[in-house]
Amino acid sequence: MSKVISFASDFGLNDGSVGVVKGVISRIDKSIKVNDISHGIPPQDIKYGSLLLMRAIQYIPQGVLLAVIDPGVGTDRKAIAITTDWGVMIGPDNGLLNLACATVGGAKQAFELENENWIIPHEGNTFHARDIFAPFAAGYASGQLKLEDFGKELNLEDLNQYLIPLTDVTDTEIKGEILYIDEFGN
């Protein structure tokens, strides 16, 4: 098992959220390397994050992807792990992981993260990256947690999807949407 977790979020770097998530990972296994993809994703912008992950997944080490852009935190949305030929992708069930999964050959299985032994007890319900996603990512990356112990297997068709909007082409115009602009304007 690869001891690399690639981590992307919309947390920014102005408070301690990224450091706390990395701290949870380190407390589970100090030898896990955390590769930061980006923490500058615009807040709650699932579309931007999904496209960023689609572009990045081809170049980051295989292993575990921990991606958290989660406007539905604190609701009944599921916390999930998706298996692919690339590795395991962990995050909220809001479509964030779909394009990255498709880029590496598609989802094979999905599991709900519900094993209480790997959920950090918490007062509030607003930091699932710390309390749920990071412990499962670290447990799996370290070999301490097997996929079948995550929780129940989910039907792939029941996962929330994010689809790229199509362009509308006529004889006189093309209508589309700019989906992603990097720091250099590309």
What is the predicted function of each stretch?
Residues 106, 111, 120-186:
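Anionic-ligand-binding alpha/beta catalytic cores of soluble enzymes and soluble regulatory domains
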Residues 17-25, 182:
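Short, solvent-exposed amphipathic alpha-helices that sit
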Residues 7, 11, 30, 138:
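Short acidic/glycine-rich loops and adjacent helix/strand connectors
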